[in-house]
């Protein structure tokens, strides 16, 4: 009997592009969704509806504990070991307010189908032992500190302004202990005191069973094979399905009775900026039309410089915020949030009243809606839904399936409607202004809750003092004997967790043994000199008066990456580059010889373009280049040339816009200063790269003081600032231009192809000759070897360490693959660092990254609970492995296969494959290089890995060969100075550009 005979099936096509099948078991309520997404990757998710009623973090702690082993596979981390051996890079999961989802991605379907039944076995029958709870959730160390993987993770959120405000909003709008009000991640106090193993076991029994489970698979897989696996799962676990399972979230929520305002104080190093959040209850989650309409309305109100909220709050001489954004959280009643970030502390009380009194009031009148712009926005939204089919279809499918699982009560029509949003968006375009007025009136005039996040520098020290007192009291209560017992208990837990190991026979069954021919996207990298061009390709490439590459691939869109070389910028001019790029989409411009206002420019590009952006670097690498990216439908190809000209030549710098943008960027920098990871990253970059490089100077945090100064200078002496920006433009033009086009050239009407579209480049004397750009790996690196920086960040309770050394290798070097595999061997899920650092609760993440394009090896210790101990143990483990050469064969095979996964994941979508093709031009590697690289990885021996890859790893811990940055809470500065005596204490201001 075919496996599918035991299932009923509902079929639809995701937004007209990808076939989607939803199978429902005839025996239980188990459902399996399969989306036929093309490409080499197979992505999966197993989701459960999960409801909590306390801050104990039961959904989150359970999410962590299921990975510790199952009753059938009672080996810590075996799931990730098997996943690595089956061409994955471990597994992952997330916990949300109303569901928990577990993910798996592999190259090809063979490995996916091997791992899936083992994965589900872990989910349905986890071990859930006391020793696992101790190391993974919370324990007290022999020194009296609190630790654990979950505890380390949640430390980073406890004192964040965003988290504090969110908790307050939930407290105000939901009843006490309501599932939407509690912190599903777990509060630190609860993790220490009230979260217990018994509660976790009861929680698992209640929610983790077949009738509450949906499996989603995206990729080219055999449906019968997937369903056969699920038949076996169902037969094995049928007895665990409860006779009666009350549907979670089966309650009603009352309206917010009256509008209220609440203030919460938040610890921060910079008390000049706070935040404001406004919340409302809105529609039912099954009202998909209103959901789509609100997203469009939010775009209308907030996106681009012509948007009302931009004008009312950001683009002002004296801004009220640096950014404004909307968010909808689906639930029994959808929860709308409006967030103002970077609000000057003296204006915190002005944001919400102005929103209601001006923005909302004005949009209760039909005449104030620009319906032409609204139509452009809806068209753009439709096109972006189609783009997602090429760029991120698995994520889109999983989101729809989980939404259906949570809210649609197994209604097939709602399922089809949810997965075909474009049908409704097309109808939405015909709605009159009165429709949008009704939406504004219905939701934004309803009672709301406003929460104001007030920054408080004194709280940083107060919280630190309270934590010190708490730990001191904890140590006193335990006493010397109790601390010794705590240390011994931890050691015993670690020993128990790691006592059992899978047999060689089991591991041999669960491995992909052959490197298969994956279903890759065909991409041709072509220039006008390429042999065997088709007539259409030849005509296309003959248009350009500069060097151009065509990356011909199966896409419905045309995308240009318009590159400018910034090597001629002085350090003073380069410090203006961030502002320059920000202004390109926010300024007036010459269009068809007419000076057009910034508002009308924004309106025009919303009409003409699907997407556009500007950044430094090519896919985040080769930062010397400034990269203007524009995307249109194939039927609008000529618009690429039009808008490339407008954004480069046509922009007219306006003093008022410069003032507004500079203030906005300074405000965004203040938000970034609260994040320890960001600060540590900026600090290490300051020691790795040359001072006059984009790697240093294209950073809002570094440029905060300069942007503040420019915002003032441009009002006093606009000519000087305008001259500086024009110098930046001329310097960028001086090296000419290169372009990379991503398109299916045969989908472009030949009549549209004309060299006349690009004559403006030749006509502008500022453009240098458009010779082919080249770059060297690591060309911006200028390591200050031996330097160490230690910096306090009051907005975060976690610690972060980055350590970087030089790697003398590029993509063609013999040393590269052994070093890459060695880094992956150490860092892989359930590898040496994972077990010793994350597994013992010292830090949330410990990874070694080998970066050939930057010629660097970097150690990252992320969200450390015990940073000094985590670092010392990491160093000792790596040194021991390098010196002894002792390698686990099973883990080595897993490292090779998970590295193949990383290589192939980058070309897992057609857009990703095209970006790899572009990068190959700078790496000076042929287009099929990825396949050759995978073969070389596959054939590497462990002896070669240690012999060739070991020395670069050893240099990472030679004090003469590395730089190090450490970001910690200010209360830990003295402790870290003792642990790292060679480090220099600095302030965030020391990282900033001197102006």
Swiss-Prot record:
One of its GO terms (molecular function) is metal ion binding. Coiled coil: none annotated. Transmembrane segments: none annotated. SUPFAM superfamilies: LuxS/MPP-like metallohydrolase (SSF63411). This is Uncharacterized protein C05D11.1. It comes from Caenorhabditis elegans. The lineage of its organism: Eukaryota, Metazoa, Ecdysozoa, Nematoda, Chromadorea.
């Amino acid at each position: 009997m075919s496996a599918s005979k035991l299932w009923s099936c509902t079929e639809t096509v995701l937004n007209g592009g990808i076939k989607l099948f939803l199978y429902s078991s005839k025996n239980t309520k188990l459902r399996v969704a399969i989306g036929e997404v093309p490409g080499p990757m197979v992505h999966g998710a197993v989701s459960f509806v999960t409801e909590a009623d306390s801050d104990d973090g039961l959904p989150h702690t359970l999410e962590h504990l299921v990975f510790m082993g199952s009753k059938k596979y009672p080996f810590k981390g075996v799931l990730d070991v098997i996943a690595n051996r089956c061409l994955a890079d471990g597994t992952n999961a997330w916990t949300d307010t109303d569901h928990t989802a577990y993910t798996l991605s592999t190259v090809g379907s063979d490995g996916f189908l091997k791992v899936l039944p083992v994965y589900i076995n872990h989910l349905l029958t986890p071990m859930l032992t006391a020793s696992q709870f101790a190391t993974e959730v919370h324990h007290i160390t022999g020194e009296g500190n609190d630790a654990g993987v979950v505890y380390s993770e949640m430390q980073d959120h406890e004192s964040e302004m965003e988290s504090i405000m969110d908790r307050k909003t939930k407290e105000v709008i939901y009843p006490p202990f309501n599932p939407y009000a509690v912190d599903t991640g777990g509060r630190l106090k609860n993790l220490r005191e009230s979260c217990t193993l018994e509660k976790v076991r009861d929680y698992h029994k209640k929610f983790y069973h077949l009738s509450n489970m949906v499996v989603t698979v995206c990729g080219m897989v055999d449906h019968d094979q997937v369903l056969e696996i699920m038949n076996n799962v169902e037969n094995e676990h049928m007895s665990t399905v409860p006779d009666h399972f009350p549907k979670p979230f089966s309650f009603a929520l009352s309206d917010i009775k009256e509008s209220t305002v609440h203030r919460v104080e938040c610890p921060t190093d910079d008390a000049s900026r706070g935040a404001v959040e406004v919340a409302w209850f809105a529609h039912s989650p099954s009202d998909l039309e209103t959901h789509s309409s609100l997203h469009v309305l939010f775009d209308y109100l907030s996106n681009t410089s012509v948007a009302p909220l931009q004008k009312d709050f950001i683009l002002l001489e004296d801004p009220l915020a640096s950014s404004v954004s909307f968010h909808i959280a689906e639930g029994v009643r959808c929860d709308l949030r409006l967030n103002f970030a970077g609000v000057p502390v003296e204006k915190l009380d002005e944001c919400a009243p102005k929103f209601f009194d001006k923005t909302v009031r004005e949009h209760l009148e039909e005449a104030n809606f620009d319906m032409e712009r609204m139509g452009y926005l809806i068209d753009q939204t439709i096109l972006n839904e189609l783009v997602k089919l090429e760029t991120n279809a698995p994520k889109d499918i999983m989101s729809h399936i989980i939404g259906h699982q949570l809210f649609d009560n197994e209604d097939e029509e709602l399922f089809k409607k949810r997965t075909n949003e474009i049908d409704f968006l097309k109808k939405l375009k015909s709605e009159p202004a009165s429709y949008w007025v009704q939406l504004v009136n219905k939701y934004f005039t309803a009672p709301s809750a406003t929460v104001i996040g007030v920054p408080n520098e004194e709280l940083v020290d107060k919280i630190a003092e309270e934590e010190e007192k708490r730990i001191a009291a904890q140590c006193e209560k335990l006493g010397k004997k109790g601390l010794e017992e705590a240390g011994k208990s931890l050691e015993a837990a670690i020993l128990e967790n790691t006592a059992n190991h899978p047999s060689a026979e089991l591991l041999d069954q669960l491995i992909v043994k052959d490197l298969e021919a994956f279903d890759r996207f065909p991409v041709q990298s072509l220039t006008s000199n390429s042999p065997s061009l088709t007539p259409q390709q030849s005509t296309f490439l003959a248009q350009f008066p500069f060097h151009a590459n065509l990356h011909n691939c199966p896409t419905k869109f045309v995308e240009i990456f318009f590159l400018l070389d910034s090597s001629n910028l002085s350090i003073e001019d380069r410090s203006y580059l961030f502002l320059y790029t920000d202004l390109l989409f926010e300024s007036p411009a010459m269009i068809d010889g007419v000076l057009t206002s910034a508002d009308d420019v924004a309106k025009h590009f919303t009409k003409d373009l699907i997407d556009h952006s500007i950044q430094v670097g090519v896919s985040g690498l080769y930062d010397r280049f400034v990269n203007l990216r524009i995307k249109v439908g194939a039927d609008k190809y000529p618009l690429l040339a039009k808008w490339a000209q407008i954004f480069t030549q046509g922009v007219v710098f306006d003093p008022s816009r410069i003032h507004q943008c500079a203030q906005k960027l300074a405000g965004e920098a203040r938000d970034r200063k609260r994040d320890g990871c960001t600060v540590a990253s900026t600090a290490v970059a300051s020691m790795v790269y040359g001072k006059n490089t984009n790697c240093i100077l294209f950073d809002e945090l570094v440029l905060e003081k300069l942007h503040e100064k420019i915002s003032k200078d441009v009002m006093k002496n606009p000519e000087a600032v305008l001259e500086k920006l024009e110098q930046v433009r001329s310097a960028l033009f001086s090296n000419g231009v290169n372009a990379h086009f991503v398109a299916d050239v045969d989908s472009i009407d030949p009549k549209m192809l004309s060299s006349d579209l690009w004559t403006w480049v030749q006509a502008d004397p500022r453009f240098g000759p458009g010779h082919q750009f080249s770059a060297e790996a690591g060309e911006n690196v200028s390591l200050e070897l031996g330097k160490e920086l230690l910096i306090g960040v009051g907005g975060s309770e976690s610690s972060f360490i980055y350590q970087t050394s030089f790697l003398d290798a590029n993509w063609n070097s013999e040393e590269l693959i052994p070093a890459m595999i060695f880094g992956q061997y150490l860092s892989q899920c359930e590898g040496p660092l994972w077990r010793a650092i994350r597994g013992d609760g010292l830090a949330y993440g410990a990874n070694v990254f080998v970066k050939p394009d930057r010629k660097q090896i970097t150690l990252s210790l992320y969200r450390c609970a015990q940073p000094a101990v985590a670092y010392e143990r990491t160093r000792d483990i790596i040194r021991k492995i390098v010196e002894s050469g002792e390698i686990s064969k099973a883990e080595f095979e897993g490292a090779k296969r998970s590295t193949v996964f990383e290589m192939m994941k980058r070309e897992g979508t057609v857009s990703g494959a095209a970006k790899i093709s572009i990068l190959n031009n700078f790496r000076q590697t042929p287009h099929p290089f990825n396949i050759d690289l995978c073969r070389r990885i596959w054939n590497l021996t462990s002896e070669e890995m240690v012999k060739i890859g070991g020395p670069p790893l050893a240099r990472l811990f030679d004090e003469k060969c590395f730089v190090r940055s450490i970001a910690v809470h200010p209360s830990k500065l003295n402790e870290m100075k003792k642990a790292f005596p060679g480090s220099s204490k600095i302030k965030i201001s020391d990282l900033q550009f001197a102006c």
